[in-house]
Amino acid sequence: MRTAEIREKFLSFFEGKGHLRLPSFSLIPEDDPSLLFTSAGMAPLKPYFLGAKPIFGGREWRRVTTCQECLRVGDIENVGRTSRHNTYFEMLGNFSFGDYFKKEAILWAWEFLTEHLKLDPGRLWVTVFEDDDEAYEIWRDLVGVPEERIGRFGEDENYWPGGAITHGPNGPSGPCSEIFYDRGPAYGTPDETGPNTGSGDRFVEIWNLVFTQYDRQGPIPGPGILKPLPQKNIDTGMGLYRVAAILQDVEDFYRTDTFFPIIQEVARMSGRPYEGKTSVSHRVIADHVRAVVAALSDGATFSNTGRGYVIRRLLRRALRHGYLLGLSDPFLHRLAPLVAELLGDFYPEMRENLPAVEKQIRLEEERFLETLEGGLKRLDALLSGLKPGEVLPGKEAFRLYDTYGFPLDLTVEIAAERGYGVDTEGFQKAMEEQQSRSRAAMAFEREIFKKGAQVLEELYAERGATEFLGYNALEAEAEVLALLAGDQSLLEAGPGTEVQVVLDKTPFYAEGGGQIGDFGLLEWPGGRARVETTRKTERGIFLHKARVEEGVLRVGERVRAVVDPRRRDTERNHTATHLLHAALRAVLGPHVRQAGSLVAPDRLRFDFTHPEPLKPEELERVELLVNRWIMADFPVTWRYMPLEEARKEGAMALFGEKYGEVVRVVRVEGSPLEGLESKELCGGCHVRRTGEIGAFLIRSEEAVSAGVRRIEAVTGEEAIRFARGSLNRLKALAERLEVGEAALEERLEKLLAELKEKEREVESLKARLVQAALGGGGGASLEEKGGLRWTVAELPGLDAKALRQAADDLVARGADVALVLSGGQAVLKLSPKAQGMGLEAGALFRALAEKAGGRGGGKGALAQGGGLDPRKAREALPGLLP
């Protein structure tokens, strides 16, 4: 039976038992920051186990079934080496939130396994918690499992969470019952006589039934008290791939139909045949590529922290095993389409996101293989210096790992092939000495010898400001002068470390004049750091905020500084900002002055002084002037001059910017006929000619504050994308309304007029409905207490507005306290007389809700809410009146 068929049989079976089938939730938990990935079938349903109402599709469902994709990396070192561990798996589950309990869960599990999957009842074993007589008796008396195939175990094996009674945590917990399948003596060891015995694979756990019935309370650690929960829940999990291996009669899940095609493709790529349990690398690659594709398809990205590092680690581990098979070029991305083909029918996001996933994997592979190549060269040099039979020192093996990300197992493998050993104990000692923070990231802070501010002052005194090369180049060779972390100076920084890098010269533009700081890469032999942004001190020393991704960055290192090519888009937007400023002055008048700006690769934002919103024709005129300027392809030039001279020439200064004695003036020629010319003091980056901007489109115009307006615009390809998107939306709207685009506005006006007329009709009908309901009584007879007339009316089918109108009408008819109910909604209205006697609507409604259920509030004469029991409300209201 194919895996997809098993999955469908399970979900259909429990649908037949009154369960709602839900699609798999994302691997990326939406509202649970405690989880990196969804790691169990019940994880996305946690709120409903804790008491939240399980509302799906507008109704309450107490029974749910899912096939949930999960990702766990706690036992990653065992993946590929055993038949029980994998990272990405699918968990079949049926859940009850305060509905059925042990009897149904056990009977249905047995029914599904024996009648629908046709498993031999004689090969099924079960275990229960040692004190759970109820579950034991259900298995023995109702199901008919012989006592010799029912095992009783303690809290470590058959209680959830494991060991909770003695060790905690406090909270919902309960016994569990596990179902095992006996694969026969061929899969076991002599000491394996039943579930949880021996070390073989004979007895395979296929289903765990958790009976959440207690609230564990007490000291941690220490013996806890188990108090019965008011709501008893069922949480079950069946391992889809384990069941598939049994039904497909293969030795383990690696040979099932969703795994084995990947293993076969790895064997074909590498020329190394798969030989079962000994082919660890084939297994690791198949497992890890599935996990990486699934995580990326759900929105994860590679990074050095959190879930991004988990999938990076999985990819690199798979690449290392590929290297052991002789796969020295990127190959994992070529397996991604196969993963999507095998799983995409049930997880369509894998097919939908495949192009992006392939690209991400390819780029990540290329980066890591570059690192491996550098490590291989270093290892070759080290081994060449050893005598036959000697051992590579552990500190050298660790340096390979530290600097090049070169894995120890690969070092051992290559050294062994050439007749050398590796001091693995020395490797571990070196790692401990470096005080590795975790497997997720490592940071090195050697010889913290000076405060960062002191270092910057000394650098400026010795070398002056950073030399900026970015006006003419996006790449440059530079020397690392300092590394700063917080207020401390470092001599070196390893993978995962975030530092401020000071270079002797740089092509990176430092944030200023509205233009964002450049981002990109610093590269050196065996290493790379990603620059996230660039700023500079008042003395002109550039600080590159960077995170080391590969290798170790050291003071004195020669690096290649590479600005991200999107800087060209920033240049387009910066020059366009100057053109926009001049065009606004030409259209609106000389009162327009810059009041702020943002220049980024994907957009520009320009704040300017102007007292009122721009008229549509003014915006159109501004946009047209800028685009004519662009099409004319005028030159953009700049030169340095004394500040006073620049001001005399009419160069405009930027808002909030500080200038020195000598300034840079950027000039853009314009058409004398249009009265256009731009001349501004600016240290930013610009295009050489206006034609390079391509196009200019205004996206929005709005107020920032009194007398200050803001325009957001796009240029170049972003402008084309924006225009195309707008046209596509217009076309789609026209098609939806079944008119030509030219007639769209007329059609919309007609529809809006019709809508207003219908709304008037609806309001009229609601008013008549209220009057009819009140005229019919609606249970709204007036009663009196303490001089106040009160009434409770039930009027089905009204919305909140109509309810308020009904309450107003009742007060107008003489009621001092009117409570109107419709469905789950309620409105309470007081007359001036009732208020004069000290009643307040909000307080009265809350008091009523305490006695009749529900919730709500208000103030003065009006309160509203929902959930009141009509009978209880009618009985309770007079008792709350004075």
Curated annotation (Swiss-Prot):
Which transformation does this protein catalyse, written as a reaction?
A: tRNA(Ala) + L-alanine + ATP = L-alanyl-tRNA(Ala) + AMP + diphosphate
Q: What is its main location?
A: cytoplasm
Question: Which residue ranges are recorded for the region named Disordered?
Answer: 853-882
* Co-factor remark: Binds 1 zinc ion per subunit.
- Compositional bias ranges of the Gly residues kind: 854-868
Q: What is its EC number?
A: 6.1.1.7
The entry's localization annotation reads: Cytoplasm
Q: Which GO terms describe its molecular function?
A: alanine-tRNA ligase activity; aminoacyl-tRNA deacylase activity; ATP binding; tRNA binding; zinc ion binding
Say yes or no: keyword Mitochondrion present: no
Required cofactors, per record?
A: Zn(2+)
Q: Name one GO cellular component term.
A: cytosol
> Pfam families under this entry?
DHHA1, tRNA-synt_2c, tRNA_SAD
Q: What does this protein do?
A: Catalyzes the attachment of alanine to tRNA(Ala) in a two-step reaction: alanine is first activated by ATP to form Ala-AMP and then transferred to the acceptor end of tRNA(Ala). Also edits incorrectly charged Ser-tRNA(Ala) and Gly-tRNA(Ala) via its editing domain.
Name of this chain's protein: Alanine--tRNA ligase
Native species: Thermus thermophilus (strain ATCC 27634 / DSM 579 / HB8)
